[in-house]
């Protein structure tokens, strides 16, 4: 009767899909799986070294692109400065002429000022918000002291151009200083033997090794260890300490980059000369500084626009020609200033890319030094404890395979594989080892 009840219980359990998997491999088979997994780990160790060198190549490529950008910036700077010189020359010539059409321009200016003030303060209250009262008084004083002739010859645009030129020079100097210091450190780092020699045979693997008459650290198992320290001294090696100068230099290079990337000197100027009147918060600073930002809103006031359209050629044709010459050179200077700013942004992007690569390099170096320390012994890198296939269960998906492994000095790591990764798949242990390495590295980063 008891036997019958037991059979019924087993059948019910089976029907409910609650039978857990059983160990399916012998000790010899587990050993073979361990050997296969360790081969994969050994290959990944060598890939880690190559990963460091790959990042080095990317940094060098970025550095070469930076140098090319600097050449382009130098050419663009010459063109921009030439256009600025032409603009200043035309401005000085125009200022030398007696002011004409004064009555017409002054009448329009008196109607332009209240509209300009109202438009600017409305913008400031909506976008900038703070300090409207003080800004309003400053603006009224600024407008009363300004001349419609300054307005007529686009003096505000010329002043904006000159200020942008000053800021752009400051930005370029800051980035140049940062990149020069970081590049010097990086060049010194990459001259080290680690980067200038090819690694040894990456396919070597000997899980059990040979009996040693001398201490095992004189016969390092990993080719990584042998390529990093081919003539090892007596005593355990600490690869983290060996790499410490590398870590220090990478940190110094990162600091050289990051300090400038977050420096106030790296605030790019607003060069959207053609987008006057838009809700640009950067105009707030200019308005608070000297009220000239309000002149960017002249396009919203009809009488202000009429000042720009005043034709004084009948009174003084030469002055009209000079004004046209000024406007032409001004447009060229604005276009070249915008192009120059785009190149500066590209250079900043290269700096950010290099900073990110330095962070990756530091992370990869940390991983390589950790692997080098872990692979000095004679034991297999990866040992498989159990391989179990589960049928359907309330907590475990149907037909998954669980592989419990010990990797290096870790606690047991459980790798769960879906049904499509069969135990008969030649890449079965590669997948197990890959997932185990990922988990091991994740836990190492958290410690």
UniProtKB/Swiss-Prot annotation:
Its main location: secreted. PROSITE patterns: CLUSTERIN_1, CLUSTERIN_2. Detected in Sertoli cells (at protein level). Detected in cultured Sertoli cells, testis, epididymis, liver and brain. Proteolytically cleaved on its way through the secretory system, probably within the Golgi lumen. Proteolytic cleavage is not necessary for its chaperone activity. All non-secreted forms are not proteolytically cleaved. Chaperone activity of uncleaved forms is dependent on a non-reducing environment. Polyubiquitinated, leading to proteasomal degradation. Under cellular stress, the intracellular level of cleaved form is reduced due to proteasomal degradation. Residues 1-21 form the signal peptide. Coiled coil: none annotated. It is found in: Secreted; Nucleus; Cytoplasm; Mitochondrion membrane. GO terms for biological process: amyloid-beta clearance; cell morphogenesis; cellular response to growth factor stimulus; central nervous system myelin maintenance; chaperone-mediated protein complex assembly; chaperone-mediated protein folding; endocrine pancreas development; estrous cycle. This is Clusterin. It is a peripheral membrane protein. GO terms for molecular function: amyloid-beta binding; low-density lipoprotein particle receptor binding; misfolded protein binding; protein carrier chaperone; protein-containing complex binding; receptor ligand activity; signaling receptor binding; tau protein binding. Keywords: Chaperone, Cytoplasm, Cytoplasmic vesicle, Developmental protein, Differentiation, Disulfide bond, Endoplasmic reticulum, Glycoprotein, Membrane, Microsome, Mitochondrion, Nucleus, Phosphoprotein, Secreted, Signal, Spermatogenesis, Ubl conjugation. Antiparallel disulfide-linked heterodimer of an alpha chain and a beta chain. Self-associates and forms higher oligomers. Interacts with a broad range of misfolded proteins, including APP, APOC2 and LYZ. Slightly acidic pH promotes interaction with misfolded proteins. Forms high-molecular weight oligomers upon interaction with misfolded proteins. Interacts with APOA1, LRP2, CLUAP1 and PON1. Interacts with the complement membrane attack complex. Interacts (via alpha chain) with XRCC6. InterPro entries: Clusterin, Clusterin-like, Clusterin_C, Clusterin_CS, Clusterin_N. Belongs to the clusterin family. PANTHER family: CLUSTERIN. A motif (Nuclear localization signal) lies at residues 77-80, 441-445. Glycans are attached at residues 102, 144, 290, 327, 353, 373. Functions as extracellular chaperone that prevents aggregation of non native proteins. Prevents stress-induced aggregation of blood plasma proteins. Inhibits formation of amyloid fibrils by APP, APOC2, B2M, CALCA, CSN3, SNCA and aggregation-prone LYZ variants (in vitro). Does not require ATP. Maintains partially unfolded proteins in a state appropriate for subsequent refolding by other chaperones, such as HSPA8/HSC70. Does not refold proteins by itself. Disulfide bonds join 101-312, 112-304, 115-301, 120-294, 128-284. One of its GO terms (cellular component) is cytoplasm. The modification Phosphoserine is found at residues 132, 394. It comes from the Eukaryota.
